[in-house]
Amino acid sequence: MLAFENILQRIESEISQLQFTNPPKSLYEPIEYILSLGGKRIRPALTLMACNIYNNSIENAIKPALGLEVFHNFTLLHDDLMDEADKRRNKPTVHKVWNANTAILSGDAMLIAAYQLIGSTEHGHLKQVLDLFTQTAAEICGGQQFDMEFESRMDVSEEEYIEMIRLKTAVLLACSLKTGALLGGASQEDAGNLYAFGINIGLAFQLQDDLLDVYGDTATFGKNIGGDILCNKKTFLLINALRLANKEQAEALRSWMDKKEFDPAQKIQAFTSIYNELQLKQLTENKIQAYYDASVENLKALQVAPEKLTILKEVCDHLMHRQS
């Protein structure tokens, strides 16, 4: 089995060799910029790790893995534009370095580049991998639409929110794992269990992101703390705050959410104080643990030697205890 560090090194090496040589250069500079910002590279890493569980060689999974990473960064580029985010990985976002129109068009070019890379999948697995990716891409768009619609709703349920983050975040992790498994020669049953593992770990991952947006550190998180609060984004914490708040707390939350002009630090502090009063940090951590426990059961169902799953388990354990 390849070490996680070796897999990451291979991914970074392959990304650095990606060439966008078609004119005009200005269309592709933002793509090179966002890919150069780094990141966890967890999606391509999951693809290669899943492949490696079933096959000593990961070569046939390299290009599809790169395609999934390019696609992921495309979603971030458009996400940042829609959220009007200033920072991504502690660097200015694409629409801040260039402009909104450039971010839209370069993002479109990234989506095409992702399809080109995934289209390089070996013929025997091409249809299944491409179908899975296309379904995933459509689901992610649906998740983003739900996310935007939730911003103007005050009655979003926890169940609706979980479905939204399943679509927006978890399905791509699941797709990455299943793609790697299929290319490694896994059975359909094992590929399905790895997909379910990806869903559960993805839900835990996004809930951890919600938590870090409130309780993280800007220096390590790579994004401004409280960004979701400032945008009135319906996160797991806000949805449960609105559900559990007493009359006074509910009025305070709604008052802040209705304000068009406010001091950002004061709004973040006000929300955080109410979250603390309602013990939402613990509630969120309990939910994260539940999805993590479910993901462990998915791995136990795999028809492989337990030692082959050691690296995958270690990486996911690290994700669940991250600060960035």
Question: Which residues make up each language-model segment?
Answer:
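All-alpha prenyltransferase/terpene-synthase fold signal
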Residues: 1-324
